[in-house]
């Protein structure tokens, strides 16, 4: 480009310094005479102006002279445009511009993209298997890498399998997919927050009910322990006072039950030959009371079941239970324990009662069975609570060894 363009005074020579990059050769310099201008349209100025109208010069670019008498009055292009158009070259962007391949991702099989492909594959199929997902992704990779060497291709295929299993394990941990043996099922993301909240409330209520049931069972067991230990102490005291053991026919062994009914009730009892089964038939309702309820009537529980326990009786009751249960005994005496008692007895018009049935009813909460049981009288009617058995979970994390199963 030209460095300088200088113009001397009017009516003198026009000197042009040519481009440094151009080769040196003779330069034609055209001189032109600029006559003093006559009337010209100039912008209106305010105040005095320092511009000399008679000495005005029109600066023009050197152009090809058309005639000797035609003055050079200007250029169709401004200087900057004129010089830029002489040296400007146009370049087009390469087809690979803007594409940056990451070093660790070949053919779009990086960890992030591969995880998305695993997501899309399982979501599209709904129910599939690990081998099916891996096979589809490996097939896509092989179709996209035809020019790869065998060793590199085998390494990439093994890497894809490993990353596919990792992605499936993460989706299972997030509960987006589920696995049953070799089958994989799509679950999806949970979007219904209101339903989840309602489910949590229902689950919370169920757990609170179970806590209440456990509290009631604990209260019954504490009362039984206090009643039996207090009964043992009382019998020992009576034997020391009379200095002899009671007669065998005057002793009632525990466990036992008491069946009560109205005096006008007609009771028919049938006994089997081996005296192992008894059939009772009542023409009116009746009640069955177990040994713990009878001991409560006798005052062996110090009134803990009703919350009316004196300070002295409370001290004795605390001495009859392990130290870890003493706070619960105090709550029972104050009436702040969470247990609830019922007083309605079991009623029926007729039932078979075997010796084993009588024993089970009498023992009650001392031996809690897994199937649950019902307790009459002051016992709480406790529904069966199924214990969740811990099953052997064979659904380990997915690995490449699953293909050999």
Swiss-Prot record:
SMART domains in the record: DP, E2F_TDP
DNA-binding region: 108-190
Ranges for region DCB1: 209-241
GO-annotated biological processes: DNA damage response; negative regulation of DNA-binding transcription factor activity; negative regulation of G1/S transition of mitotic cell cycle; regulation of transcription by RNA polymerase II
Main location: nucleus
Acidic residues bias: start-end ranges: 384-405
Name the UniProt record assigns to this protein: Transcription factor Dp family member 3
Organism: Homo sapiens (Human)
């Amino acid at each position: 480009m030209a460095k300088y363009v200088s113009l001397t005074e009017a009516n003198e020579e026009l000197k042009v310094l040519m481009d440094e990059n151009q080769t040196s050769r003779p330069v034609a310099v055209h001189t032109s005479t600029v006559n003093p201008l006559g009337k010209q349209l100039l912008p209106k100025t305010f105040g005095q102006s320092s511009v000399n109208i008679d000495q005005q010069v029109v600066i023009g670019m050197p152009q090809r002279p058309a005639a000797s008498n035609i003055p050079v009055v200007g250029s169709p292009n401004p200087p900057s445009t004129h010089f830029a158009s002489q040296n400007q070259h146009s370049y087009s962007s390469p087809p690979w511009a803007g594409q940056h391949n990451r070093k660790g991702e070949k053919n779009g099989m990086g960890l992030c993209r591969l995880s998305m492909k695993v997501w899309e594959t399982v979501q599209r199929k709904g129910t599939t298997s690990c081998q099916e997902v891996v096979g589809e992704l490996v097939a896509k990779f092989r179709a996209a890498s035809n020019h790869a060497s065998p060793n590199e291709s085998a390494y990439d295929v093994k890497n894809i399998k490993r990353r596919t299993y990792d992605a499936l394990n993460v989706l299972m941990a997030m509960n987006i997919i589920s696995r049953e043996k070799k089958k994989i099922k799509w679950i999806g993301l949970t979007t219904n927050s209101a339903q989840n909240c309602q489910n949590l409330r229902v689950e919370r209520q169920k757990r609170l009910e179970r806590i209440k049931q456990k509290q009631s069972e604990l209260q019954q067991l504490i009362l039984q322990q206090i009643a039996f230990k207090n009964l043992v102490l009382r019998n020992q005291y009576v034997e020391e006072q009379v200095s002899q053991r009671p007669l065998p026919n005057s002793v009632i062994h525990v466990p036992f039950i008491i069946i009560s009914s109205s005096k006008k009730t007609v009771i028919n009892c049938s006994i089997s030959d081996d005296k192992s089964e008894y059939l009772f038939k009542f023409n009116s309702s009746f009640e069955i009371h177990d040994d713990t309820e009878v001991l409560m009537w006798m005052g062996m529980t110090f009134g803990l079941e009703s919350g009316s326990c004196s300070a002295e009786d409370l001290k004795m009751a605390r001495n009859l239970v392990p130290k870890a249960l003493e706070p619960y005994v105090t709550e029972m005496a104050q009436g702040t324990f969470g247990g609830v008692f019922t007083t309605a007895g079991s009623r029926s018009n007729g039932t078979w009662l075997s010796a084993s049935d009588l024993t089970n009813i009498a023992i009650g909460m001392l031996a809690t069975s897994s199937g649950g049981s019902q307790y009459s009288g002051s016992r709480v009617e406790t529904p069966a609570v199924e214990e969740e058995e811990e099953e052997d979970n064979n659904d380990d994390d997915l690995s490449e060894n699953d293909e050999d199963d």
